[in-house]
Amino acid sequence: PLGTDWLMGTYMARRAAENVGGVVAAPISYGYRSQVRTGGGAHRCGTTNLDGATIIALVKDVLKEFARHGARKLAVIDAHFENRFYLDEACHLAIRELEYAGIQDVKILKMLYAERLKPETMAKVYEGTEFPGLDLEHGGIMETSMMMYCYPDLVRMDRIVDEGTAKFPPYDLFPGNPDWV
């Protein structure tokens, strides 16, 4: 379904917050453009992209505002593979600007939630098939399984098509070639 990334990221953030007594902010529901070689692309219906600079500025400002309000332990849950380097930069810049402002005690944990799945869980999910890697898991077995567990009412099993594992050349092409997906 549309919104899988922010839905899963929010679900994981809420579960983590329950364990540590944290608070979950509203999700940023847009991200960097999905790449064709990760099973996405702007040709996919509903795909709405932000430029990398926009993501960096948005997340940096939100982190700084939370710190201004007194938060000192922050977590950024990355639920969209292509966001990873932009979120890294946002965290670095937020810390640097906070330190320049004299706020020295803020810590930011940033993680891609899918990297925290237990090996035994992955073995069950991919039983009888090969795990293609996170970069090719866009809307694949893992994401669908997680959505079925967390939001079963949003998964339309009757619309699932087995497209097989994509095979891409070892380079990117701009604009992306939708025939690769």
Task: Identify the role of each PLM range.
Residues P1-L74, A79-V181:
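Extended, histidine- and acidic-residue-enriched regions that form the cofactor-binding/catalytic faces
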